[in-house]
Amino acid sequence: MELKIDDLNQNPKLGSSDRPNSYIGRSVPRERAKKLLEGKGNYVDDIALPRMVHLNFIRSPFAHAKIISINISKAKNVSGVYEIFTIKDIEKVCTPWNGVLGHLGEMRSPTQFPLAKDFVRWQGEPVAVVVAKNRAIAEDASELVEIDYQEIDAQLDMETALSENTQIIHKELGNNLFWTRTVDQGNINDAFKNAYKVVETTLDFARHTGVTLESRGIIADWNSSEEKMTVYHNGQAPHMMQSIIAKHLQISEGLVRIISCDVGGSFGIKVHVYPDEMVAVAVSKIMNRPVKYIADRLESYSTDIHSRCHKIYGKLGVDDKGKIIAFEIDDLSGIGPYSVYPRTSAIETNQVLNLSAASYVVPNYKAKGTVVFQNKTPMCQYRAVGHPIAVAITEALVDKAASECNIDRFEFRKNNLIPDNAYPTKTPSGVPLEDLSHHACIEKLKKLMNIDELERYKKESLIKGRYKGFSIINMVEVTNPSPLFYGVGGAPISSQDGASIRLEGSGAVHVSSSITEQGQGTEAIMQQIAADQLGVNIDTVRVTLGDTDTTPYGGGTWASRGAGIGGEAVLKASRQLKNNILKIAAVIMQTKENDLDVRDDNVVRKDGGKGMSLKELAQTVYYRGHELPPGTNPELITTSSFLIEGIPFVFTNSAMGCLVDVDIDTGLIKIEKFWAVEDCGTQINPKLVEEQIKGGVVQGIGGALYEENIYDEYGNLVNGNMADYLVPMAYEMPDIIVDHVVTNSGRSILGAKGAGEAGTGGAPAAIMNAVNDALKVKNVEVTSQPITPEKILIALGKI
């Protein structure tokens, strides 16, 4: 019988704290943090290559217009300007694309070009590009490029996008519909007819975007002698970009190298294909020299993908025992003029349909999603894709139903949540669920919050004229996606990840992983897993990420998959390497491999006899192989890959609560406390998990209370700067209390699920419900996010 690595007795139970070099489950400081805090990071903009030129884009000042002419003659005469390109030049070397996925039904997305062709369809769309000695010269020359436009009425309102007389953005499509989908499970009409109580609401979610510390940036360097393209890019998925650049610039994929340097945040913003970045690569190929483009902050607001932008109607029916018997939603979303490539702009709506009511037992479920085009910045996936909308509509209706039935909202949820012993099961929409713990999480949340005390606090505050409210919400979170998410639809997006691990001649360990790092601590958890499974000190483990020439093929970092998929690949490769080490050591030490183990960088005998260091073993293999018996396998490097099979995602679940104070005179909202109980399976580094949840909550606060991309009636983005686009800062951060339930994923040895998006997905619902709880005594509610002071005062009838 073939020996399986997972069966070897030297593989310890994960998180064995009584064992030397046990790192899984420990809050180990991340090594990379020291480098970044000392200002020694290496970001795209830090790189300067010989002969490098700089780009500045001339962008459309209009939301919708026809391009009549482009005159570049004056700008080309500026000293230091090398070239000025329009789509006529760029399309010769870079083909256009369509943002569609084959498995989600008909998507009607027009072809998108790297630069605008004939028409501009959002304010900020790139029309031409100036190539100059430096960015300042390029910007000055851009002022001299003369573009004549014929302005066209902009279609901005998603609610009128399909009206009979509306402006059609792409005439060839006949209307402004991109995609629609309907889910229909059970008999929704009969269920509502027979319902004891029916509640309904409509919620609005404003557009907002991810404001990363580092803006998007790219350096492309075409080497014509080797026909090789090297790209320095601050993205999340190097192998995806390698495939796409190779395809659209007609380069052999193996001759495209993507290097992701240090990346200053992403949140999903940097996992998409942007026209300006493809132009940079095309210009490098045309000019045969390095090209740099760094988006400035004004460009970021008008060109980085936006998100949310939903209006959703929901209806919930219960029987006379307070059991949910019917749930229906109708979601409308506007995505800008194009579906973003290659992930498409349908996924957020698709996740709303999949995830609404996903925590609850719902026998009859109907959901419709409609996605339309607008003359605004393109919209696509951003942290917690679809979750804030799905969770908010679900939990708003659950609160309403509990109130209508005169049942405590905690008890109402307990009576309707999927039981913890019911798995495997499915969401109301039919998506498989495994290994969740809604009841355990909500019970722990109740104890953390001390709900009885909160009720007393509310009443006492009201006597003093202060309006307090609190909430309880439940959610599921999509993590660890499989090929059934994107690959099945034909997108060049890998769902598997790989890891290579090598024992160096010094006895140190080198890990190479296809996962990438944008600040979440990926490098640290890879070190921990490798050190734990090999039995070495973590200081001896070095990690390489983000280079398609030196790392195994894989998907990179998105959808909370780094630990669950990339970490599993490292674990498997570590166990294989350890197995090889012990086999070689057994030959050298003339014993059985099962009598040996690796601890503290040494191969040790379990009976306490003399062992040998990993350095000694490595140098014997690498330098003195003649000392090994013939036939000994000297392999001290192993590679392993991992992917989820059979289901589209591995889900996690959370329960959250929020306490707010609403000032009814000013409309100001203060979050006094926030609680989150998360079940993400095995926690490799609890401190990093806590940081992810807290950071996610703060981004959720941004969407709930502050962040909105505001457009005027002509399609001009009026708050595209850091002064006018509000984000939560240190003062707005409440006390966030995090706790956990641990239900390991049965899909892997490591048992890890994702934790990066729960806070962002759940916080908006928790905040909205808490605000409405505070306003309940006034018999008013708010149904639009962000919940600004103005909206509070309007609801109260004060303005």
Where are the language model's segments positioned?
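Glycine-rich loop/linker segments at domain edges
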Residues: R26, R32-E38, L104-P110, N175-I218, ...
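Extended active-site and interfacial segments that coordinate phosphate-rich ligands
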Residues: K34-K35, E143-Q150, L156, Q236-P238, ...
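Short acidic, glycine/serine/threonine-rich loops at helix termini
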Residues: C94-G99, A141-L144, H233, Q242-I244, ...
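Helix-loop-helix junctions that connect adjacent transmembrane helices in secondary transporters/permeases
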Residues: V100, S163-L249, P419-A508, F642, ...
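Thiamine diphosphate
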Residues: S266-N288, K292-I294, T522-I529
